[in-house]
């Protein structure tokens, strides 16, 4: 029989970026907030200690900060006629494990959403006609505009300590000839920090791209180009271009993470609690099956715990949020044959493209620098 804990105002499942942001917002609103993280407690110190963290075998090969898919994984199939098989090799998507989640091991690339992406169906129908999009394509508009989201993007960049060069600010051109992105949407403020310096290889690429007519620009990154203190009082140090970003804890406190940028502001609060090693099994519902009443989880000792709450927020990795909703009987599961249902519909992930470049033997790219 499950042990029933004292009720809280809000329980958050997962403590990555989503969980940390929601915890800060809700505690500021005066709510008693409990965050449940299925993995262990981890932080820049001591888990990111130098030189132990500069260990490619532990992090790049054995993938210490990622979900251990030998213990738990998802199944994958390419069509409804295929047999669903367990994913046994991390590749496209990289769920995190432990406090910070994927926000601890990400690289720090910090683009804003393009306004067109928020109204993709309307954009293409206006441009190419309503018959352009295939009937079986489920693409749809988000229902929120870039203009509505812009103030939140602006504040998030201040929290993250994002480095970059704006193209326009309040309609005024400020980034031409300075590495700004001519395709970026307008901004209400410049980036909190100037863009990172370009390495020799980046300079070579930029020169070559410009010569053939492209418009290279400085990547916006949540990797600080200088010392920085965010609105929550969290301090960050300048990036030293070590190259151990994606898949690693940043020992320089230069890469934004929930652990560096938000957790220090939450720890002293009397209305916040973080419980690691708390693996949520399901969201509990009332008798009408339309309202969440809390969650049930298993703690580090294997005990089943029921945590009542007025508000339940699913802030785990996308795949795990959907799985929890399916296990809890929330919403109608998506049926790819009939097209009915919402839960699990429209899963999408980022596209990545790479190129290989060959140089003559007298071209040096400063190979010893990591980033």
Question: Could you say what each language-model-derived stretch is?
Answer:
Residues 8-35:
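N-terminal Rossmann-like FAD-binding beta1-loop-alpha1 element of flavoenzymes
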Residues 25-28, 32, 39-56, 269, ...:
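Glycine-rich loop(s) and the adjacent beta-strand/alpha-helix scaffold that form part
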Residues 78-106, 112-126, 133, 142-146, ...:
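FAD cofactor-binding and catalytic pocket of flavoenzymes
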Residues 1-7:
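A short, basic/flexible loop-to-alpha-helix module at the beginning of a structural domain
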Residues 233, 286-293:
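A short, glycine/Asx- and small/polar-enriched loop/turn
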Residues 40-65, 96-98, 102-107:
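Conserved N-terminal glycine-rich FAD pyrophosphate-binding loop of Rossmann-like flavoproteins
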Residues 59-61, 65-73, 86-92, 117, ...:
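Conserved redox-cofactor binding core of oxidoreductases
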């Amino acid at each position: 029989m499950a042990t029933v804990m004292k009720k809280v105002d809000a329980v958050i499942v997962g403590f990555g970026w989503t969980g940390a942001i929601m915890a800060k917002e809700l505690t500021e609103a005066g709510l008693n907030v409990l965050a449940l993280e299925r993995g262990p407690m981890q932080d820049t110190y001591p888990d990111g200690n130098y030189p132990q963290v500069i260990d490619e075998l532990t992090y790049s090969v054995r993938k210490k900060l990622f979900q251990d898919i030998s213990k738990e994984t998802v199944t994958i199939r390419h069509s409804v006629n295929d047999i669903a098989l367990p994913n046994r090799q991390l590749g496209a998507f990289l769920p995190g494990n432990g406090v910070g989640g994927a926000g601890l091991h990400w690289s720090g690339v910090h683009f804003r959403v393009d306004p067109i992406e928020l109204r993709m169906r309307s954009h293409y129908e206006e441009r190419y006609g309503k018959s352009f999009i295939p009937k079986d394509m489920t693409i749809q508009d988000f229902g929120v505009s870039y203009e509505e989201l812009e103030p939140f993007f602006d504040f998030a960049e201040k929290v993250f300590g994002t480095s970059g060069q704006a193209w326009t600010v309040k309609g005024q051109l400020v980034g031409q000839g300075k590495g700004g992105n001519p395709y970026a949407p307008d901004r209400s403020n410049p980036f909190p920090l100037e863009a990172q310096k370009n390495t020799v290889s980046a300079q070579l690429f930029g020169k070559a791209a410009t010569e053939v007519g492209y418009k290279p620009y400085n990547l916006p990154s949540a990797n600080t180009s200088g010392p920085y203190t965010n609105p929550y009082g969290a301090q960050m140090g300048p990036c030293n271009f070590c190259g151990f970003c994606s898949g690693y804890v940043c020992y320089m406190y230069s890469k934004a993470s929930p652990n560096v940028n938000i957790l220090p502001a939450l720890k002293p609060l009397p209305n916040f609690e973080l419980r690691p090693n708390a693996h949520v099994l399901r969201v509990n519902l009332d008798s009408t099956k339309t309202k969440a009443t809390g969650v049930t989880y298993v703690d580090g000792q294997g005990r089943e715990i029921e945590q009542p709450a007025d508000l339940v927020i699913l802030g785990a990795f996308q795949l795990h949020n959907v799985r929890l909703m399916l296990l809890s009987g929330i919403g109608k599961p998506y049926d790819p044959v009939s097209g009915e249902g919402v839960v699990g519909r429209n899963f999408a992930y980022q596209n990545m493209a790479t190129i290989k470049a060959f140089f003559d033997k007298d071209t040096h790219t400063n190979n010893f620098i990591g980033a």
